[in-house]
């Protein structure tokens, strides 16, 4: 049967209300969806429009006030887009190119730029390398590591690519059938990961008569 779910999520002591997306984004949480074409990007809009979209809509950035009137700060938008295009190596003709015409890897980089433009404290990234080429995978993963180590940003990656997770993560949580089974280090044996992905905590397997190497 169904059970009532309860609990709360706090970020730096502030409780987050996930029924109010705007308040969560304003609190410093950003997400890069695995469905970049469905929900991650506005495919018929330019790269620069995509990058600043959330920051403009949620935080009111990239707008200039003239008395009772508000005007888009096109110069600042262009400068911001060019900075991200350079830092993330987005291969394009320029900031005005439509996002729908980019390769999968470059679309993913635009999604990351869009999230970073919100200056988040906490970044969720779902399947960051799905559907992109090897070179783009390397750059995307290196970018996520740099955000954590150089900017102190907390980055949570959800991925089915275990070896990729091992190469960039400090610790890896294994979830099976909706439940947290274990949290392992990247150096843990593959056998432990195999057990955890089957829903068995490695330490419990040993207690029940399994072998330890």
Where do the protein language model's features map onto the residues?
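Glycine-rich phosphate-binding loops of nucleotide-dependent enzymes
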Residues: 1-213
């Amino acid at each position: 049967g169904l059970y009532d779910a309860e609990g709360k999520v706090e970020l730096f002591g502030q409780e987050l209300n996930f029924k109010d997306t705007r308040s969560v984004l304003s609190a410093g949480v950003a997400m890069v969806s695995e469905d970049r074409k469905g929900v991650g990007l506005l495919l018929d809009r330019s790269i620069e429009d995509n990058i600043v979209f959330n920051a403009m809509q949620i935080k009111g950035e990239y707008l200039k006030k003239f008395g009772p009137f508000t005007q888009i700060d096109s110069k600042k938008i262009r400068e911001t887009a060019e900075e991200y295009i350079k830092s993330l190596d987005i291969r394009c003709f320029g900031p005005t190119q439509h996002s729908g015409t980019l390769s999968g890897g470059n679309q993913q980089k635009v999604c990351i730029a869009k999230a970073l433009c919100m200056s988040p404290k906490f970044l969720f990234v779902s399947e960051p390398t799905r559907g992109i080429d090897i070179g783009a995978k390397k750059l995307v993963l290196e970018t996520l590591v740099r955000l954590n180590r150089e900017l102190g940003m907390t980055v949570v990656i959800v991925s089915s690519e275990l070896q990729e997770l091992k190469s960039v993560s400090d610790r890896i949580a294994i979830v099976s059938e909706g439940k947290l089974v274990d949290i392992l280090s990247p150096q843990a044996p593959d056998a432990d990961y195999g057990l955890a992905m089957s829903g068995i905590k490695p330490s419990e397997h040993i207690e029940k008569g399994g072998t330890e190497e």
